Amino acid sequence: GFSLRRGPEPLLNAHPFSSLNPDLVLDAVESTGLPCDGRLLALNSYENRVYQVGIEEAEPVVVKFYRPARWTREQILEEHSFLQELTEAELPVVAPLVTNGLTLHNCEPFLFTVFPRKGGRLPDLDLDTLQSVGRTLGQLHSIGARSRFQHRPRLTVAGHGEASRRFLLDNDFIPD
């Protein structure tokens, strides 16, 4: 890990990404051995921060900064391993780049990953496409069932469906 050009420390109750500025993003990417050309574009992301970063004389990369204290190193590495397994099975996913022999890098207080930039689009929702999406999801689940994840939380009906429903009902979020 490293810490360059970070500026003032964030306030105690500041947003988890308050110290993530453009200089820090570029420094983080360059710490992996990739020479940045200064281009930086923030991309949509729900809970993390994701950027497209220009690389000198190469295609841009996509860099994902994980929300501090949300995921452990072990959980992220388990996800990376699964993405690699899916890639080897020729599923249409994007596995992280290995830079400096690693897929997960540290720039305190952030863990981050570099991905190749891959284009995509929303699928047409015709019957053939829906069947293809269904087959792909089936393959994903089949590959995922080969080994038991040790660190990632399990998505279950009881834990994510019933518990969420109970919370909404118990706290009057759903009108009568």
Each model region followed by its residue ranges:
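ATP-binding pocket architecture of kinase catalytic cores
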Residues: 55-149
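A generic short alpha-helical patch detector that favors 3-5-residue windows
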Residues: 17, 106-107, 156
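Conserved NTP-binding catalytic cores of kinases and kinase-like/nucleotidyltransferase enzymes
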Residues: 2-97
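Conserved beta-strand edge residues that scaffold enzyme active sites
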Residues: 43, 100, 151-154
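Residue-level recognition of alpha-helical structural elements
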Residues: 39, 126-129, 176
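Short secondary-structure boundary/hinge segments and terminal tails
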Residues: 47, 104, 118, 158-159
